[in-house]
Amino acid sequence: MKILIMGAFGFLGSRLTSYFESRHTVIGLARKRNNEATINNIIYTTENNWIEKILEFEPNIIINTIACYGRHNEPATALIESNILMPIRVLESISSLDAVFINCGTSLPPNTSLYAYTKQKANELAAAIIDKVCGKYIELKLEHFYGAFDGDDKFTSMVIRRCLSNQPVKLTSGLQQRDFLYIKDLLTAFDCIISNVNNFPKFHSIEVGSGEAISIREYVDTVKNITKSNSIIEFGVVKERVNELMYSCADIAELEKIGWKREFSLVDALTEIIEEEGK
């Protein structure tokens, strides 16, 4: 099977590439070069003929992991380009191919943030044009996935690294409940979804998470206990965002129906991550 990974140098994209490349022919799509990357087959969107190169590759599966979260005060146009225009541009370009386009979306409601809004708009546009495309479109409503060596701007990683270095952690009330999914479990979920693509309709949405919601407080306390940290945890000193979502949890019935099963508990996953990052 031929798989194109959009956003191949990102946290999720790079791990998907490593996970699939031993069993499939994998090519990555990236905006700019990364000298530290170990991925060999890359199409760069800075090249004039990057669309033509995708068509020449003739992927069976396209996984879009490209995302702009707006965490670094990026303008709205940056989020629109990354979260809407890029996936729709690729989807339209492969309209003649019998390929499956898997878009990594979010479980967050569109009024939560501009990121969530633009991600949802991409799916709405895809639904409007999917009848003109030979293949399929699958939207993944991803919950909060995490793993070793994710970006410093990710909540899960920030807490781990501050606890490892015994730095104070300033947070909101911590009463929000989130569905945390370990990256290794997410990769096997992708495997199950790809193995069952023929059973899905032309446009389809799947919720992807652990199926268990825990509070931010419980997550932070678990990290602190495993790291044996001396960090001072300050709940309630950070103001909650406007439209803060207080509960989010995936309904994983469909994932379980196609054979997926979560393997790592929160404690097991965090123990593994902390061992890797603490070396």
Curated annotation (Swiss-Prot):
Any Pfam family the entry gives: Epimerase
Single GO molecular function: oxidoreductase activity
Top enzyme category: oxidoreductase
Gene3D superfamilies, per the entry: NAD(P)-binding Rossmann-like Domain
EC number: 1.1.1.342
GO biological process: lipopolysaccharide biosynthetic process
Leader sequence residues: none
Pathway noted in the entry: Nucleotide-sugar biosynthesis; CDP-3,6-dideoxy-D-mannose biosynthesis; CDP-3,6-dideoxy-D-mannose from CTP and alpha-D-glucose 1-phosphate: step 4/5
NADP is among the record's keywords: yes
InterPro entries noted in UniProt: Epimerase_deHydtase, Lipid_A_modif_metabolic_enz, NAD(P)-bd_dom_sf
Catalytic reaction annotation: CDP-alpha-D-paratose + NADP(+) = CDP-4-dehydro-3,6-dideoxy-alpha-D-glucose + NADPH + H(+)
Active-site residues annotated for this sequence: 115
Additional note from the record: The functional difference between abequose synthase and paratose synthase lies in the side of the pyranose ring from which the keto group on carbon 4 is attacked in the reduction of CDP-4-keto-3,6-dideoxy-D-glucose.
Similarity comment text for this entry: Belongs to the NAD(P)-dependent epimerase/dehydratase family.
Task of the protein: Catalyzes synthesis of paratose and tyvelose, unusual 3,6-dideoxyhexose sugars that form part of the O-antigen in the lipopolysaccharides of several enteric bacteria.
Name this polypeptide is given: CDP-paratose synthase
Species of provenance: Salmonella typhi
